[in-house]
């Protein structure tokens, strides 16, 4: 297959780091904690997961409900939202960067989930359709995470290698076990809330006859599950309002940590170049360097040195040139000049990290 290894590491490198040192190194990685914290404190967001199924099962009358066929189509369409988010994610990341997309999609998710509140309060006919439309937007935004999560995790591991000189990916899982403890501690919160709003055996027993009258089921059938209390409209509505509130709180908490994620695409590209230089120097020291590695390293160093005293170009003037360009050909040329100017300024920033890496050998500590 035409694949290429993306991990930058010297061919002659042998990992030499103690277990506890590796754990401590990961524990000091701020970016790792930012991403982990976003997941841990956002656990409430998934509370809405049962809304469609509960709405169909417990709030689906003949007068204003939907049939089994339409419900199947609804669930299929909502689930299909994941596809479009995953397709759009790479283009959005390329245009705006991972951090901006992370914040925007998660913040928009909180807004979308809040739209469930007026729907649940109003209880319109065929409410499940309104809920499905809103959840389609939620699934669409959430699916960006399928692409973003592994991309961000890869950047975090490159950053860890940049800090420590070692590729210790396995330690992230070890330190991440803290999340298992947090999950255990928080897993009982949502069931406790359900019980508080009336989804419990006591409420079921006291209102079993009412449920039997609504559903036509026997008392023994009604008593099979405490969730049967959701057939009672006031409990159903109260439960759904609480679910929406918890989901919005979870979604809001989820995106706040991303404001502290400071790994930009530009910085990540610079880190990769620095890692390539380090790999070249290590292979050189071990006598396994080939001609291609030497040429690549020289190109990186020469490019960085040539940009050392370069002045950034005025991007605003290039943008104005695009707006004022007259004719299709002139506008195309102006856009190309703008793109080249942006790339030029980016290379200046990347070169700063590369030059810092090369020039560190001139310092007294070396």
What are these regions (language model features)?
Residues 1-289, 293, 319, 326, ...:
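Membrane-embedded alpha-helical bundles of multi-pass transporters/translocases
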Residues 289-324, 335:
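Acidic, Ser/Thr-rich low-complexity segments on the non-lumenal side of membrane proteins
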């Amino acid at each position: 297959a035409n694949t290429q290894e993306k991990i930058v590491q010297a061919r002659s490198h042998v990992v030499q780091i103690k277990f506890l040192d590796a754990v401590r190194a990961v524990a000091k990685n701020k970016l790792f904690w930012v991403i982990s914290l976003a997941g841990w404190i956002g656990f409430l967001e998934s509370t809405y997961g049962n809304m469609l199924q509960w709405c169909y099962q417990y709030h689906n009358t003949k007068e204003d409900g939907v049939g089994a066929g339409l419900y199947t189509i609804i669930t299929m369409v909502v689930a299909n939202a994941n596809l479009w988010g995953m397709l759009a994610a790479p283009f959005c990341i390329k245009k705006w960067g991972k951090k901006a997309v992370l914040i925007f999609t998660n913040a928009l998710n909180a807004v979308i989930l809040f739209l469930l509140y007026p729907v649940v309060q109003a209880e319109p006919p065929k409410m499940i359709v309104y809920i499905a439309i809103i959840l389609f937007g939620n699934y669409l935004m959430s699916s960006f995470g399928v692409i973003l999560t592994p991309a961000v995790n890869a950047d975090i591991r490159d950053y860890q290698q940049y800090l420590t000189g070692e590729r210790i990916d396995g330690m992230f899982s070890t330190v991440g076990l803290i999340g298992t403890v947090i999950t255990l501690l928080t897993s009982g919160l949502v069931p406790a809330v359900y019980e508080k709003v009336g989804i419990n055996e006591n409420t079921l027993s006291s209102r079993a006859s009412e449920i039997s009258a609504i559903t036509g089921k026997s008392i023994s059938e009604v008593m099979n599950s405490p969730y049967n209390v959701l057939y009672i409209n006031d409990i159903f509505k109260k439960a759904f309002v609480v679910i929406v509130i918890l989901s919005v709180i979870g979604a809001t908490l989820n995106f706040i940590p991303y404001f502290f994620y400071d790994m930009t695409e530009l910085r990540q590209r610079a880190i990769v170049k620095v890692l390539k230089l380090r790999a070249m120097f290590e292979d050189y020291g071990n006598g396994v360097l080939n001609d291609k590695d030497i040429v690549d390293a020289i190109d990186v160093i020469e490019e960085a040195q040539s940009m050392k005293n370069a002045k950034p170009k005025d991007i605003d003037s290039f943008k104005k040139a695009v707006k004022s360009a007259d004719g299709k050909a002139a506008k195309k040329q102006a856009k190309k000049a703008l793109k080249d100017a942006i790339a030029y300024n980016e290379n200046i920033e990347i070169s700063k990290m590369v030059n810092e890496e090369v020039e560190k050998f001139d310092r007294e500590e070396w």
